[in-house]
Amino acid sequence: MFDRYLKSVVEGDYLNSEEAYLTARMLLHEDIPEIKAAAFLSALRTRKESQEELTGFVQALYEEAKMVDCGMEVLDTCGTGGDGLGTFNISTASALVVASCGVAVAKHGNRAVTGKVGSADVLEALGVEVQLEPDEARQLLDKAGITFLFAPHYHPILKQVGGLRRGLGIATIFNFMGPLLNPCRPSYQVLGISDSNLQEAVAGTLQRLGRKRALVVHAFNGMDEISPEGKTRVFDVGEHGLEVFDIDPEELGIGGFSLDAIQGGDATASARLVIKVLQGEPGPYRDTVILNTAAALLTAGRAKNIQEGMQMAAEAIDAGKSMETLQKMISFSRDRILAC
């Protein structure tokens, strides 16, 4: 059966969600020759994955995942990564500010894949324990208003295709479906994507997964975040249907600097940058975090518009609430270690 699906994809045909689901199951559980599996994933990437295919793969992976009962509506800021622009870890800093504004956050993430650091690397450098069991993750959420869900821990089945993905050395459907697999099944999400051709498909998949509202963002400069330099295209999806609009930072009073001004570094350097933002240091890093936080607050219904969200984010940072949220996250996550 796999050969039939491989032939279809190579010839440019699309799989429906059931066929994609079955293919994912075969890749994860059957002894598919690596050359055929690589050919399938490469062909899928070449002609771009569809909403049906993403949905089928996500359904297969969710069946294998360790799920978390968060007990409340949560928001996630996990993106695909892979834009190659070297900016600091914006989504992690934004997640902390969002939580300090009173929105519960379940941050799904991983270590670095294509860049220098991932969200797990940065949080560890900040002193947060990232490898938490489901009940521990729930307790951290209850106590700090934010938790972290380390993707490999909740999706161990992906080890089955780890060698294949490393050998290919290119982004595959597994990269783009990662942010769709939060084991808390969040109600709200801001998802940055590195491939603009997949924005609509990912937005549609999020809608099928039951998100109340999600923003799928890709900047015109290639950034997989809301960019402070130039416009960002937004696919806004949820119970209201689908809307597409652009965010222009200049109209919001942000800009005048290039992406060179928000570069990251290794995990330690990135952690220092996050702390500077949370401590209220003015400049491009702060402006970028405030802009992305505002979009998350809009998504979760906490802010009526981006402008109001920016004001709320700035006030939370300046009042010390965002730094306090990080300190709680560090303390309560480390309490788990001391209790072991």
Curated annotation (Swiss-Prot):
Protein source organism: Syntrophomonas wolfei subsp. wolfei (strain DSM 2245B / Goettingen)
Highest classification ranks of the organism: Bacteria, Bacillati, Bacillota, Clostridia, Eubacteriales
What is the role of this chain? Catalyzes the transfer of the phosphoribosyl group of 5-phosphorylribose-1-pyrophosphate (PRPP) to anthranilate to yield N-(5'-phosphoribosyl)-anthranilate (PRA).
The record's similarity note reads:
Belongs to the anthranilate phosphoribosyltransferase family.
Q: What is this protein called?
A: Anthranilate phosphoribosyltransferase
UniProt keyword Amino-acid biosynthesis present: yes
Cofactor note text: Binds 2 magnesium ions per monomer.
Q: Does the keyword Glycosyltransferase apply?
A: yes
- UniProt cross-references to NCBIfam families, sorted A to Z: trpD
Q: Which gene encodes it?
A: trpD
Residue positions annotated to bind 5-phospho-alpha-D-ribose 1-diphosphate are 79, 82-83, 87, 89-92, 107-115, 119
InterPro entries, per the entry: Anthranilate_Pribosyl_Tfrase (IPR005940), Glycosyl_Trfase_fam3 (IPR000312), Glycosyl_Trfase_fam3_N_dom (IPR017459), Glycosyl_Trfase_fam3_N_dom_sf (IPR036320), Nuc_phospho_transferase (IPR035902)
Task: Output one GO BP term.
Answer: L-tryptophan biosynthetic process
Q: Which cofactor does it need?
A: Mg(2+)
